[in-house]
Amino acid sequence: EIKVESPKEANAKALDILNKGIDSLSFHVKAKELNAEYIETLLNDSCAECVELNFSTCQGHVVELADLLVAYFQKKDYDLTKLQGSINYDFFNKMLAKGKEKGNMVQTAKALIEATAQLPKYRVLNVNALTLNNAGAYISQELGYALAWGNEYMNQLTEAEIPAAIVAKKIKFNFGISSNYFLEIAKFRAARMLWANIVASYNPECLRDCENKGPNGECRCAAKMKVHAETSTFNLTLFDAHVNLLRTQTEAMSAALGGVDSMTVVPFDKTYETPDEFSERLARNQQLLLKEESHFDKVIDPAAGSYYIENLTVSIAKQAWEIFLAVEEEGGFYAALKAGTVQAAVNESNKARHKAVAQRREVLLGTNQFPNFNEKAGDKKPVEATCCCGG
């Protein structure tokens, strides 16, 4: 992930990273600087057909960003049907974090879908369940609320007369990855199964010839969940920070075995300073080791057939489905957010997990298990959150 302070510097960094084996990039761009020249400078010499490009900016400027990207891709004569990427628009995440609405979801979502109509593989409606994970939610909570989150997009936009297949193909799930190795593998497997069932309930019809067209004309590819995963910051520690490398490595392994489409490994020092070239290189190489040396990307579902993981998958699916149904009974994810139900449940989990760590019922290596009592914090201070605009 690249936070863009200068498009020229960000471009140089992106090209350097691409030459080191990465095939998916994410840019956090400043909304107030957006224009055609900015995009051209940022993406100069990047082959958009060879790499997945993901973007995020202030929610009020996502349509402007989409228009600029489409214009740039057309200018470069790319085959727009082959380009893959996303624009991180998430109306509900803002409500979850700030407790207030900003803009009109249906209006903005429709404009985004129309703006990216020529980019069929670009996802522009995001479910940032990562926020729940980083706030301390349990695995079943993260998955259950994520499903309700995605279903809220489906429900509201199909009511606005947008075909279900189009809506489903524009949704992207961004999950967090905790240190529960086997449970996380099971979570991603359960997520795909449950989401497919939810989408199928909307009877998405194929709008054109499709290889995955079902016997009744349903679009099977619409039911496929697009998943990005990011290692959690909830368990990253300021003390004995290099132990964070152990946590992020096992988290990346579980996501890869769980079958995610892409992942971000958070640098081990992100909680107390701006990651430098060293920590970013380590984070990048943690992924490349799994791909290039362990070949985790060569098997579709390596956990399939494992009695333990199959049972965990069913168990997590049941728990998450119960949470999903409870949210739907309350009127849907939007209603639950306005009532504060989701926030209250996650806050309770956060308190319970902190208490468990304090009582050593939840192990945090290097903190409550085998701590270094001689280590001092020094200049280390927790990094404060910043606005999504980059300000």
What are the roles of these predicted feature ranges?
Residues 151, 155-159, 169-177, 189-239:
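Accessory "access/gating" subregions that flank catalytic or transport cores
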Residues 120-155, 249-304, 308-320:
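Mobile "lid/hinge" segments at catalytic clefts and subdomain interfaces of large enzymes
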Residues 21, 77, 195, 258, ...:
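Conserved, mostly hydrophobic/aromatic
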Residues 261, 319-391:
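Intrinsic disorder at enzyme termini
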Residues 55-58, 101-113, 241-244, 320-337:
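Phosphate/diphosphate-binding loops
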Residues 80, 159-170, 201-224, 262, ...:
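Flexible, glycine/charged-enriched surface loops at secondary-structure junctions
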Residues 137-143, 178-190, 232-245, 273-283, ...:
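Short glycine/threonine-rich loop-to-helix capping motif typified by GTGT followed
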Residues 1-180, 184, 210, 256, ...:
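Catalytic alpha/beta active-site cores
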